[in-house]
Amino acid sequence: MDQEIGSIPHDRLVRHLPFRQQIVNWKSDYKRLLLLAYQSFGVVYGDLSTSPIYVYTSSFAGRLNNYRDEQTVFGVFSLIFWTFTLIPLLKYVMIVLGADDNGEGGTFALYSLLCRHAKLSLLPNQQAADEELSTYYRAGYIPQIAIYSPLKRFLEKHKRLRTCLLLIVLFGACMVIGDGVLTPAISVLSSISGLQVRAKKLVDGEVVIISCVVLVGLFALQHKGTQRVAFMFAPVVIIWLLFIAAIGLYNTIYWNPRIIHALSPHYIVKFFEHTGKDGWISLGGILLSVTGTEAMFADLGHFNETSIRIAFVGLIYPCLVLQYMGQAAFLSKNIHDVSSSFFESIPQSVFWPVFVISSLAAIVASQSVISATFSIVKQCHSLGCFPRVKIVHTSRWIHGRIYIPEINWILMVLCLSVTLGFRDTTIIGNAYGIASMTVMFITTWLMALVIIFVWQNSVIFALLFLIFFGSIEGAYLSSSLIKVPQGGWVPFVLSFIFMVIMYVWHYGTHEKYLFNLQNKVSMKWILTLGPSLGIVRVPGMGFIYTELATGVPSIFSHFVTNLPAFHQVLVFVCMKSVPVPYIPPDEQYLIGRIGPRTYRMYRCIIRYGYKDVQKVEDNFENQLILSIAKFIQMEGEGSSTGSYDSSPEGRMVVIRTTDTSGTRLVTRDADESECNSTPIRSSKSVTLQSLQSLYEEESPHVSHRHRVQIELSETEDINCEVKEELMALLEAKQAGVAYIMGHSYVKARKTSSFMKKIAIDVAYSFLRKNCRGPAVALNIPHISLIEVGMIYHV
């Protein structure tokens, strides 16, 4: 091939190379797409693919068990087929997957889209500069020409409606957490119960014990991460799908080929004519055929919509339809085996291989839902709706694969309680169906708003979408609610508990922010103090953490009032969430100045998305110093580049942290001896320096941090004022950095209502005392931390 290219004249070669390169790129993209589709089987479809184990058993568990005839079985299969076609295929694959938020999916992604394209967010600290983020608006959306509908104006005007919208989203998140409890219980218990088909002497209690052992092992291994065994997830699910599809095809041909006629919706009409109200009640079991569908949208961020569509249409849909059809064909001739129809329908020669692979598939399904629960809790925390918890990243290569110890053990206890308490997949299925269908129903409502506000389509189209899918899901949900006394109460109890936790934390955090906003220090008072601020300025740099994006927090005045000395350089650091999934590193830092140049006071706003990691990295100090230096240089040159957020304090500039050109600073690796031999005087006493050395010896994660020496370049001419400020910045950095944070005690005012006192003084106080501290959550070095105690009367 190379010889052929070499013989082509140059002008022809130029014409042929772009086309060849286009073919190479197409092949590369095609292979990557197929790889993503392959990997999605182990992450997205585990739950959906294990549903055939218990769908028919749950459907015939109630009064429908009195209708043991072929017509009823045909009607149930027809309902399963059309439900599986309309909800997963038509609604999710064809429509909902297109409503991604920069590649992310789930209820929080829809809510985030709505908050950005309509002013529905309740997050504090929102700024005009946030709207200039490259990930803020969808491609092609222009705010200036956006349609401003009366509905949009109505929602933006009424805060209570925006609060209700947030509560609906949180309720959906709580139901997802409920899935994290119920999915492992029903998947593992139903797969292990297959033993009773061959081991007749095995009693229910022994099956439950075996299931509990498997569940304990599953949750106990979560801290190890799944990267070592994740490569097995996709093959397990694919082999499982091929097995059950082959068995379904065999059963269809062997038992009753006429079952194919039930693909006609006419059998649904005949089913309800035959069963009446009892048929409607059975919908609570039939809906289990689509549980796990939401994972296609929720896990969109790990793949892309095309790969998920390929996997569903290419393998998931045909395999599951064949299995449901074959199982119905078997039941039409063996209705007495309905209590364990899946395992009874397996030919004896392949029973044990199928049993083993079903158990593995159940574990994969459980693992996927547990990981999704960790992800949803992290998103709630990022939006200020969940207490601080320990978040461990279990993979270096896959972003977003996390483990939360507290949530893991809570899920394990709840899952074991459900398994031991109910001991029946039918009862657990009643709870599971309610949780899953509620999330789908909430997605439908949010999707209708996205169609109007984000896609800017007609309200009529949104209403058609809402009425069509809402009526289907509403029918299933209404049927499930009948079964609340038979286990259906579990997701509501779990959701109520987590909703209280989320709302109390959000309410307390918001009240605390309002207190800071109302009691921030006046800039006039700061300016009257002069460059020294009326206190002793000691060598070093102070990072003052605050929730405010503007103004000086009250913690500063509280500190200097009790200890009238502060560092020569002050940086007010605000780490805030923006309703986007990720923020590019080059757009995270907003740098500004507080007061005149001689005050040496700066503001740094670090913006995070709801999927980003909020913590102080090892190189955070150096990044911040370089960003401030670049701001000083840009300000000195009067640069108009970048993005500015005008405010009474001055302008905020977006600093690209990956581009340090123009900072007049150079960085190089430095060993410990170089750092200690610096001529800059330190603000730390000899005793404190010895304590720091001892702390670093006992803390490997601190002592092994990458040390970088920052120096001022002398190769270029620098403005005298800029050079002086840069030198002061470097001197402060080399003298030592201290992290100042508020240690708050939030109390309700005496005039507050009784409910507010309960919420703040009891519930919020309990959560604050038992969650991780902000310094620990942000990975701030303990030896450099100064905490300032303050009482907030809200």
Task: Outline where the language-model segments fall.
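The structured alpha-helical core of multi-pass membrane proteins
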Residues: M1-V794
